[in-house]
A protein has these predicted regions:
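N-terminal signal peptide c-region/cleavage motif recognized by signal peptidases
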Residues: 20-22
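N-terminal secretory signal peptides that target proteins for export/translocation
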Residues: 1-5
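Small-residue-enriched, tightly packed secondary-structure blocks
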Residues: 25-183
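Bacterial N-terminal signal peptides
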Residues: 8-18
Length: 183
């Protein structure tokens, strides 16, 4: 197989990721409902998240983040930032990756800004990137099925989960968050 043909096969997932936002774009009302349902689902699956959510200065919720890869990979999703449980701004998350990866999956992502300062820096940015503009401490499940609490003192805490609860082997590193306008 020639290099251009191989390259085009590797770029197909990237094209799908770039096209997906127009396909999955939800109205403001639809997205607000999905955000609310996602937050409820997290609290049902992970009871320890309830107290963290109550203490958070802001909550960034992405109900559905689509990830796909075939050599090159990427992810995208739409969500909103809640302050006092009210949507104040809508966002898109995107990431690109290179490496051995084939397939796709959907997950939900919730980012908790535990301090006013962390929330303010996020809101003032134009294209905030995890691992560059701030670090998101990913919450995982420990040996006994309980949330690993060693990351709970971080100013920004994140959850990545599916229908069965928290997901493993995933990360926020390289994810970029962009403000979007919703009608």
């Amino acid at each position: 197989m020639s290099i251009p043909v191989r390259l085009s096969f590797m770029l197909l997932p990237l094209l799908a990721i770039l096209i997906a936002p127009t396909v999955q774009s939800a109205s403001k009302v639809e997205l607000d409902a999905r955000v609310s349902a996602t937050l409820e689902r997290l609290q049902e699956h992970e009871r320890a998240s309830v107290e963290l959510i109550q203490k958070a200065s802001g909550i960034l919720v992405f109900p559905r983040v689509l990830k796909a890869g075939f050599g090159l990979g990427g992810s995208t999703g739409e969500g909103s930032l809640l302050v006092n449980y009210q949507p104040v701004q809508y966002y898109r998350t995107t990431s690109l990756s290179i490496g051995l990866q084939i397939g796709g999956q959907a997950s939900s992502e919730v980012v908790l800004f535990m301090t006013d300062d962390a929330l303010e820096r996020f809101r003032e940015s134009d294209g905030w990137e995890a691992g560059v503009d701030g670090s998101i401490a990913l919450i995982t499940v420990g040996v006994g099925g309980d949330i690993d609490t060693h990351n709970l003192q971080s100013p920004i805490i994140g959850f990545i989960f599916g229908n069965q609860g928290l997901m493993y082997e995933l990360s926020f590193e390289g994810s970029k968050f962009w403000k979007i306008h919703k009608e």
